[in-house]
């Protein structure tokens, strides 16, 4: 599908932040079964979804409110860009690119989904400025932490990673 409409996030999931933090850990073993659409919806909303519809502000703060972090969702059938405004996935490329984003880490290839966080530094203006790059890295780190906390609470396996095959950056 070129567009996958996600169900509304379940804002009444059980669990506490403190419990999620106490149980948060990285894992490198993943179930091969697909993540159900409800869990994927909740995960993406928790990562960087809109939690204040009147202002369009997100679950993850961003430097200067530039909302620079885009979340790409890599599934066996294709790669998608998460559209937080419409809470949907927009197809970027058909096919299985999980190996491309594995960055040489074989354990990632079989994960049912990979999330790729990209800070679009052009939203800040000067992309070569070291401070701009630091803000983008910080913003991506905040989204990554949201993902880790949600996965801990939802009992989903996750591991933050910082590598992928550079030759596939054209997918953007």
What does each model-identified segment do?
Residues 49-51, 121-124:
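Solvent-exposed loop/turn segments at secondary-structure junctions
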Residues 130-139:
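Short pre-catalytic strand/loop immediately N-terminal to key active-site residues, enriched for Gly-Thr
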Residues 112-115, 121-122:
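Histidine/lysine/aspartate-rich catalytic loop segments that bind and position anionic ligands
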Residues 1-111:
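N-terminal amphipathic, basic helical "cap/leader" segment at the start of enzyme domains
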């Amino acid at each position: 599908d070129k567009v996958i409409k996600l169900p509304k996030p379940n804002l009444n999931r059980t669990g506490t932040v403190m419990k999620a933090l106490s149980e948060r850990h990285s894992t490198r073993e993943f179930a091969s079964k697909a993540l159900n659409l409800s869990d994927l919806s909740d995960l993406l909303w928790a990562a960087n979804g809109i939690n204040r519809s009147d202002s369009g502000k997100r679950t993850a703060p961003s430097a200067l409110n530039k909302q620079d972090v885009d979340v790409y969702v890599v599934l066996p059938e294709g790669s998608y860009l998460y559209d937080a405004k419409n809470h949907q996935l927009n197809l970027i490329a058909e096919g299985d690119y999980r190996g491309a984003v594995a960055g040489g880490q074989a354990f990632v290839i079989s994960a049912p989904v990979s999330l790729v966080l990209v800070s679009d530094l052009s939203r800040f203006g000067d992309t070569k400025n070291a401070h701009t790059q630091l803000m983008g890295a910080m913003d991506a780190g905040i989204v990554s932490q949201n993902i880790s906390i949600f996965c801990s609470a939802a009992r989903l396996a996750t591991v933050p990673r910082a590598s992928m095959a550079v030759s596939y950056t054209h997918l953007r």
